[in-house]
């Protein structure tokens, strides 16, 4: 009689792999590490995936964010051919750095409401970072051990995104919409790193009880702080002479 797979085992495998990959990186992780965390035999995992590399690529391709992920119909998951794997990785990582709100803002010569435009972009970036928090953590942890991934993620895509955001900030500075007393590259990096820390990195903080409010409140505070860092101060009312 064929053995049935537990219905939640695939989700457990994904959750555990994301956790172990984020801690050790893909290269340093063994399937036995994942199995040990799950409390199952290493051999049982090969009913679901042929290798840790296949599991890593599947996670990245699907952008496995928080939530329930259904197991594919065809198991075990197999590693695509090298050229296919590289193409899919480039496409998926590229989509993680595409923010439609930023591209729409960049296409405008001047905004009707600079504050509203900036807030829309900041919220869109925050939401994207939140959504891809776990797979992006795995990628950043694994990239130093994988030169091709490092070059794609850090040297190309991430660097291009920072430059694109800085170009938009500079354009708004020239138009008088953003404060112009700071270098646009520093302003952009400050805004983006603030978002990334609170939307993603703080969840891996060595002090998990940092005394912060709930996630929704944190998001609102970060949005307000980033807006305050980029928008010019409102003009002060003139004092009446007595």
What residue spans do the PLM features occupy?
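Short hydrophobic clusters on alpha-helical segments that form packing/core surfaces
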Residues: 13-21, 125
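C-terminal peripheral helix-coil segments that are non-catalytic and often amphipathic
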Residues: 79-102, 116-119, 123-131, 159, ...
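Short, Lys/Arg-enriched anionic-surface-contact patches
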Residues: 1-12
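Helix-turn-helix
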Residues: 20-67, 72-77
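Short loop-to-helix capping motifs
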Residues: 24, 51, 131-133, 145-147
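Amphipathic, non-transmembrane alpha-helical scaffold segments
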Residues: 60, 151-162
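Secondary-structure edge/capping motif, primarily at the C-terminal ends of alpha-helices
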Residues: 136-143, 202-206
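Membrane-interface starts of transmembrane alpha-helices
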Residues: 184-188
């Amino acid at each position: 009689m064929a053995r049935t797979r537990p219905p939640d085992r695939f989700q457990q495998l994904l959750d555990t792999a994301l956790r172990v990959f984020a801690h050790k990186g893909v290269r340093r992780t063994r399937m036995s590490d994942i199995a040990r965390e799950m409390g199952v035999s290493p051999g049982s995992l090969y009913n679901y995936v042929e290798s840790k590399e296949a599991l890593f690529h599947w996670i990245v391709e699907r952008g496995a964010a928080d939530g329930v992920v259904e197991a594919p119909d065809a198991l075990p998951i197999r590693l695509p051919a090298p050229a296919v794997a590289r193409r899919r990785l480039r496409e998926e990582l590229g989509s993680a750095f595409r923010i439609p709100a930023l591209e729409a803002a960049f296409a405008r010569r001047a905004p009707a409401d600079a504050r509203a435009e900036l807030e829309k972009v900041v919220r869109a970036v925050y939401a994207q970072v939140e959504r891809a928090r776990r797979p992006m953590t795995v990628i950043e942890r694994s990239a130093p051990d994988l030169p091709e991934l490092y070059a794609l993620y850090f040297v190309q895509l991430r660097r291009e995104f920072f430059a694109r955001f800085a170009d938009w900030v500079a354009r708004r500075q020239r138009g008088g919409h953003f404060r112009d007393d700071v270098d646009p590259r520093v302003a952009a990096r400050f805004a983006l790193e603030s978002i990334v820390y609170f939307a993603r990195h703080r969840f891996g903080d060595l002090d998990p009880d940092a005394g912060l409010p709930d996630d929704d409140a944190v998001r609102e505070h970060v949005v307000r702080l980033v807006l305050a860092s980029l928008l010019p101060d409102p003009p002060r009312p003139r004092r009446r002479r007595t």
